[in-house]
Amino acid sequence: MNRNPYSRYYVPGPSPWPFFVAISANGMAVGLILWLHRTPSFLLMGMSLVCMLLSTFSWWRDLIREGDIGFHTRFVIKSFRDCVALFILSEVMFFFTFFWTFFHNALSPSCELGMRWPPPGIRTPNPSSTSLFETGLLISSGLFVTQAHKSMRLKDYDVGPFIGLVVTIVCGTVFFLVQLREYYWNSYTIADSVYGSVFYLLTGFHGMHVVVGTIWLMVSLVRLWRGEFSSQRHFGFEACIWYWHFVDVVWVALWCLVYVWFGGW
């Protein structure tokens, strides 16, 4: 890696991690398509997932080392802020497409669906049971991670941030496990009409984002334990909080629209 002493930014050296992450994401996408067409693809998806995790870990490790060396100036951190904001905006557009699909079919059901929504034969989940508990988990986790951030800004590096992060990680993990339990007990699958397809795509991709956010929180917890954050320099943790709040907002919208409003209850 080279750095020009007269430049506000550094120029990273060649890195293989973006290439491996792209290949892994492509492999997981192909595996998902094959699985939806009832073609065995667990080996491809498993290998792609392992490669994705290892590549992401290595990429984050190099990025953290660059910051520890001193390459992350305030101009670089500002560019990171802009990039994370644009990344979250792209994620908003990603979920917007699925919500659009849901509204297109819910507001104007086709003849194939019996002009009804939910379609006949679909027993939708009760919004006041499991999903309400999941909503409480994510809202509580958002409050705890915000309190952890507030404690860090007040130069409390001992109790406040640790408790907030640990509780948030536990809430995210429990949310994912409860979501899997709900999938197990649902009376319909992803192949049962457009409702099943959109429901599992929305909740499934949101669950994947919960997993990513939980891993990011774990990385932030380890970095906090190693003393890599300060009250002024902790953008990695701050970006994680942005992402987690985005996950919270998406779930609240999903619960209100999919479970409550158009859930048939």
From Swiss-Prot:
Annotated EC: 7.1.1.9
Which UniProt key words apply to this protein?
Answer: Membrane, Mitochondrion, Mitochondrion inner membrane, Translocase, Transmembrane, Transmembrane helix
- Name the source's superkingdom: Eukaryota
Instruction: Choose any GO biological process term that the UniProt entry carries and state it.
Output: aerobic electron transport chain
Q: Which reaction does it catalyse?
A: 4 Fe(II)-[cytochrome c] + O2 + 8 H(+)(in) = 4 Fe(III)-[cytochrome c] + 2 H2O + 4 H(+)(out)
Gene Ontology MF terms in the entry: cytochrome-c oxidase activity
Location comes to: Mitochondrion inner membrane
TM regions (residue ranges): 16-36, 40-60, 83-103, 159-179, 198-218, 241-261
**Any single Gene Ontology cellular-component annotation:** mitochondrial inner membrane
Supply the InterPro entries for this chain.
Cyt_c/ubiquinol_Oxase_su3, Cyt_c_oxase_su3_dom, Cyt_c_oxidase-like_su3, Cyt_c_oxidase_su3-like_sf, Cyt_c_oxidase_su3_a-hlx
**Top enzyme category:** translocase
Its record classes its membrane topology as: Multi-pass membrane protein
Instruction: Note the subunit structure.
Output: Component of the cytochrome c oxidase (complex IV, CIV), a multisubunit enzyme composed of a catalytic core of 3 subunits and several supernumerary subunits. The complex exists as a monomer or a dimer and forms supercomplexes (SCs) in the inner mitochondrial membrane with ubiquinol-cytochrome c oxidoreductase (cytochrome b-c1 complex, complex III, CIII).
Protein family per UniProt: Belongs to the cytochrome c oxidase subunit 3 family.
Q: What does this protein do?
A: Component of the cytochrome c oxidase, the last enzyme in the mitochondrial electron transport chain which drives oxidative phosphorylation. The respiratory chain contains 3 multisubunit complexes succinate dehydrogenase (complex II, CII), ubiquinol-cytochrome c oxidoreductase (cytochrome b-c1 complex, complex III, CIII) and cytochrome c oxidase (complex IV, CIV), that cooperate to transfer electrons derived from NADH and succinate to molecular oxygen, creating an electrochemical gradient over the inner membrane that drives transmembrane transport and the ATP synthase.
Q: What is this protein called?
A: Cytochrome c oxidase subunit 3
- Which organism is the protein's source? Mytilus edulis
